[in-house]
From Swiss-Prot:
CDD domains: BAR_Atg24p (cd07628), PX_Atg24p (cd06863). One of its GO terms (biological process) is piecemeal microautophagy of the nucleus. GO terms for cellular component: early endosome; phagophore assembly site; vacuolar membrane. It comes from the Eukaryota. This is Sorting nexin-4. Residues 38-49, 645-661 have a biased composition (Acidic residues). Disulfide bonds: none annotated. It is a peripheral membrane protein. Its main location: cytoplasm. Residues 1-10, 26-36, 56-70, 624-640 have a biased composition (Polar residues). Residues 77-198 form the PX domain. InterPro entries: AH/BAR_dom_sf (IPR027267), PX_dom (IPR001683), PX_dom_sf (IPR036871). A 1,2-diacyl-sn-glycero-3-phospho-(1D-myo-inositol-3-phosphate) binds at R120, S122, K146, R165.
Amino acid sequence: MSDQFTSIQWDRTEPEGDVPGDSNDHSQVQINSSINLIEEDQGQEQEQDDLVTTNTVVRGGNDSDSNPNEQIPPRDVYIRSKVSQPLKESDGQNFYISYLIETETNEPGLAKTKLKVRRRFSDSNFLYNCLANDFPTSIIPPLPNKQRLEYIKGDRFGEYFTTKRSIALNNFLNRISKHPLLKQAKIYHIFLEDSVNWNTFKQNLKISSNPNSTVGGGSTTSANANGELDSFSDYIMNAFKKPTYESENAKEFQEITDKSNKLQENINKIDKIYQRVVKRQSEISEDFRLFGDEFKKLNQILTEGSDTQFDKELSQQFTSFSENIYQISYDSFKLTRQVDLHYLTSLKDLDHYISQIKNMIKFKDSKLLDYEMLQNYLNKAIAEKNHLMNGNNVSGSDGAMNFISKKIGSLRGKTPGQTYSSGNETNDRINKLNEKIEFLEREVKETFELFHTFEKNLITEYQLFDRIKNDEITTNLHELSQYYLDYYNSVVNHWNDVEIPHSEHLTDELHVLQQSQLRKNLENISIDPKLDVNSKLFEHDDVRLNNDHIRSDLRSIKSQERKNEQVHKQDQEQGEEQEHEQDQVQNQEQEQEPEELSREEAEVLETPVQAQEQEQQEPEELHASQTESHTQSEPQNDNQHNFDDDGSDEGLVDVEGLEQW
């Protein structure tokens, strides 16, 4: 920045030999208001009425396509381009890829209605830079990213990479053709036409690295370096600042930013999901191909050495089945490639297109910061002028210089009353400050008007972007659905051609075989088991090795089952033992409780029981002693016994009484 302020200019200097102009003056910023932004029949469509606003186009100098009275063409004017057929060519030293661009149009500015031309990627990049310089306030569709891994690993000439790039370039040209201002650019028409003007225009016109300014043919490397340094310094200064001025459209821009972030987030999610879908579909396609190969081998094995009509028909059915399997594999591969090349590439391009909007909003904020910075410089200049006029000090250095100048003036014989004489340094500085203030006021006014106009134009550009984005998303989804419809229709059509014999048809054939006695001949024919011996399809003992592997696998499976059964039995036995031990412990606890109770009761009842037993034992002993004495005295005392029987039974009564007692 020079002289403590910056100048906001979007200029474009024409190259030497094109259009004469004043090389000493900077080309001024021209804001061309196009009142009729949308086409003549736009009033019939309600959704397009919002776009009928003042659209400002910042163009450069005296360029031929910067006519202020230039009108937007009607809606029936169209330009349809298609990029295809990438071709590897050489310019004698290096190889490059050129793309065929086929255009159909009714644009009056073009010489033909159908155009064909081949352009390189660098030509498209040059077109993008020219449009960015001619229309700095418009949202220019982005080009595909050139910083790709293919440039490092050397696969930039491969079919996959070039096809994807041609689709991305096709999206780039279609977006330009849908923009009402960009499709009117002269450089765009020259790009589409097959003429020598393109190479001449490209050689004479030189575009600087700054996308907001064009440097003419007389520019030097030092000028470009200074411009890049200024841009880098401005970027560093504005990176950590935010504008304090809040415009009337601040809420609308905040809503635009939120919508853009949300849309970009959803697009990234869809892209990740379809990346996985494409990967799974490619694996399915490969599996179908391998399945078709194995089915074809099986058909050859079953039909080898068989010449009957039934075998021939069966072989035809097997062949038709395997061919349909191959067709499914091819259709799956085709579907995967279409989704990958067209749909995913369109999602990536739309993501980059949204990033362009966010960059334009950041560019608007940077211009607002420049306006605030110029306003601060103007306020400082006015404050410095007021201090000088009032005789006050602004800063230490300025006060010291003022004091020294006054002392020198006093030594020369100048009195303090002669402060504003013609030779006074303070007077000269005030005059310089007045010039600086006038220049800053003019710059501040122009910068604010430019910012205000840029803000309105950016709102209109977002509406145009929203319309282009909706059309593009609708077209992409329609194409995606068409890809899947074509895939399933192809599968159904191919499988309908396969004739599967019904049970009645098979019964009739068997009946014919029985009637012609072919069945007996077939029973006598010994057919070798094709899957047990080696043949052309199975060499190097593949069948035997396969059977060995199967037997070993069966053995391992059976051994594993036995081990599992043993482990299960051991677990059951351990569980039963644990339950038995628990039952024993519970029974022992229950037995110990009544034993303790019986011991206590026995101690309590021991005394009365012993007494009762003694009482019962005494009469028994007495009775036993009497019976013994009676038996001993019976032969000696017979008379006495008779006497007792006849006379009295006193002795017996006494015994009974004792017993009763």
